[in-house]
Amino acid sequence: MDSKRKNQELSTSETADPSLSKTNKKQKIDMQEAMKNQNEVSLLLVGKVISAVAKNSNCVFSPASINAVLTVTAANTDNKTLRSFILSFLKSSSTEETNAIFHELASVVFKDGSETGGPKIAAVNGVWMEQSLSCNPDWEDLFLNFFKASFAKVDFRHKAEEVRLDVNTWASRHTNDLIKEILPRGSVTSLTNWIYGNALYFKGAWEKAFDKSMTRDKPFHLLNGKSVSVPFMRSYEKQFIEAYDGFKVLRLPYRQGRDDTNREFSMYLYLPDKKGELDNLLERITSNPGFLDSHIPEYRVDVGDFRIPKFKIEFGFEASSVFNDFELNVSLHQKALIEIDEEGTEAAAATTVVVVTGSCLWEPKKKIDFVADHPFLFLIREDKTGTLLFAGQIFDPSELSSALDRA
C-alpha cells in the first residue's frame, strides 16, 4: 500500500454500516495503525497454530480467513463477551474498526486479478442462522450489502446434518473443490444457532516460472535423521535472497495483473541454516513485531545451488486449543490446502465459527546458495498491506497431510 493510502484516515461512515454504531459520531480510523495491528495478530496466529496443533509437522492455514470470519462474527452478535473477546484478540477498539479493515482488504487485496493476468482470488462469506431466532434487520442488511455474504435461515433443530453438508458444499464450491469438508461430522447439532463462514482461494503464477525439465529428485532431510526423495525445482536465474544470522529468506514474486498498482503478492521461504532450528526461527519471527518487514530481500542475486521442493499439503484443525481463552460455546474450524509447482501456487482455505446455545541499484556479486532440503516456514503475503493470506511449514514434502483429523 503506498504511503498516501497507508496514512489515509477513513471515517466509519465511509467503511461500515451506520447501524453498527450507537451514536451518530464519525469515528476516525487510522488505517495504517489498524492494519499494522491486524498483521501483528496474523503473525501471532502463525505461532499459536503451529505450536498448538502442528508441532514438527506439515501445516498450512489462512490467518486472513480466520480474521475475516471473526470480524463478521463480532459485528453480528448480541453476545457482548464474545464480541469483547474477538476485539481484544484482533487488537481492535471497535467493530467499526474491524469492519473498516475488512472493507479495505476486500476492495484491494482480495479482488480477483485473473482477467488482467494477475492471481485468481476469491474471498466469500456465508452466514447460516437458526430459523426460529429473531434477526435484527440491520444485521441481515449488513450480511448482504456490506460483507457481501450469502445468508440463509436454516433448521438446525431438526436438520443439523443437512445444514452441515450444505456448508461443506458451499466451501467446496468457492475453493475450486479443494476444500471438501470444512465441518466434520458432529460439529453441527440441534443446539447450533449460527455458523459464520469464510472461504479464500488463491492461484498465482510465478513472475518467473521454473523450467520443468530442470526438476530433479533429491533428498529432503527429516528431523529423525532419515531422508525422503522428492522433486526439487531448480533455477540458475537471479533470485530475491538475503542471508541473515542463522537463516535465509527467499522471496518468490507472483505475476501481477496489468492494473495491479496497489498490491504485490509474494511467497516467502524462511530457511534455517541448520535443520533442527525451525522452532527457534519461528519464535524469532512471531515474537518480534516488524520482523517480516525488516527481513525482505530487496535485490535479485546470483545463485549457486538453488533448490526448493514441490509440495502439496492439506491441513485442518479446530481452534479451541489455539484460542485457549475462548470458553464461550463457540468452535472455530479451518481447513486449508496448498500446492507448489514450477508454474506457481494454488491455495485455498475455509473457516467457520459455530455458535451454539448459551452464548538503490546496488546488488552483491557473491553467489548465494538456497537449498530448501530441510524443514522451513513459508508465507504468502500481499506486500503493500502486509496481509498474510497463507502460512505454514514443511517438515516432509512427500506427505500430503499429517493432521487432517484435527479439523
Swiss-Prot record:
Signal peptide: none annotated. GO terms for molecular function: serine-type endopeptidase inhibitor activity. GO terms for biological process: DNA damage response; DNA repair. Residues 344-368 are annotated as: RCL. The record marks 358-359 as: Reactive bond. The keyword RNA-binding does not apply. Residues 1-28 are annotated as: Disordered. Keywords: Protease inhibitor, Serine protease inhibitor. Probable serine protease inhibitor. This is Serpin-Z2.
